[in-house]
Design a protein with these regions (language model features):
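Extreme N-terminal, non-catalytic leader segments
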Residues: 1-30
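Conserved nucleotide-sensing/catalytic segment adjacent to the nucleotide-binding pocket
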Residues: 57, 69-119
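Hydrophobic positions on the alpha1 helix immediately C-terminal to the Walker A/P-loop
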Residues: 44, 48
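Hydrophobic anchor at the beta1->P-loop junction of P-loop NTPases
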Residues: 33
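Post-Walker A helix-loop "phosphate-sensing" segment adjacent to the P-loop in P-loop NTPases
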Residues: 49-60
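Conserved glycine(s) of the Walker
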Residues: 40
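The conserved Walker
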Residues: 36-37
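A glycine- and Lys/Arg-enriched "phosphate-lid" helix/loop adjacent to the NTP-binding pocket
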Residues: 139-169
Length: 169
């Protein structure tokens, strides 16, 4: 099932919102939200969490940071940098794939725990892409694309990229 999510100024519009509310009242969904840096993953995740009264949300950046306390930089250098500032001895795409594969077991563990506890969960982040996480572990996978400007990209890279927006119902 596909849902259309649009951004207009500071508003997130989910065209099939009523359908989502009905579905989420009946089940505790496990949701993944992927997309490039600055696409609005955190914004959409927070809007879904708040307005659909879901239980938990975590970003892959938080998961990556936790993993860096347990893994050595010499073996997992891709976890010790941001996706938009990859390590220098490999291509950005290779860095992205390595990062996605490195955090996949931790993401899958979070999904398994949420399912076992009967709680809803949103995981959002750059390192989420189809084919990396086992399909049977989640209910919905949103991939966002960015139509942002260079100015918005600079805000994201330099900081202050997460802003509050309202959900149009």
């Amino acid at each position: 099932m596909w849902f259309t999510i649009n951004f207009i100024k500071d508003t997130v519009i989910i065209e099939e919102l009523e359908d989502l509310i009905k579905i989420f009242k009946e089940e505790k969904p496990l949701i993944l939200i992927g997309g490039i840096s600055g696409a609005g993953k955190t914004t959409v995740g927070n809007a879904l969490l708040t307005n659909l009264e879901l239980d938990h949300s975590i970003g892959t950046g938080w998961i990556r940071q936790i993993l860096t306390t347990q893994l050595k930089k010499e073996y997992y250098p891709e976890l010790f940098t941001h996706s938009f500032r990859p390590i220098t001895d490999i291509t950005p795409f290779e860095n992205f794939i390595k990062g996605s594969n490195s955090i996949a077991p931790a993401i899958e563990a979070c999904l398994k725990r949420a399912k076992a506890e009967g709680t809803s969960l949103i995981i959002e982040g750059v390192y989420l892409m189809p084919g990396i996480i086992e399909d049977s572990l989640y209910d919905y996978f949103f991939m966002l694309e960015s139509k942002g400007s260079t100015l918005e990209y600079k805000k994201m890279v330099l900081g202050n990229s997460h802003q509050k927006v309202k959900l149009l119902i």
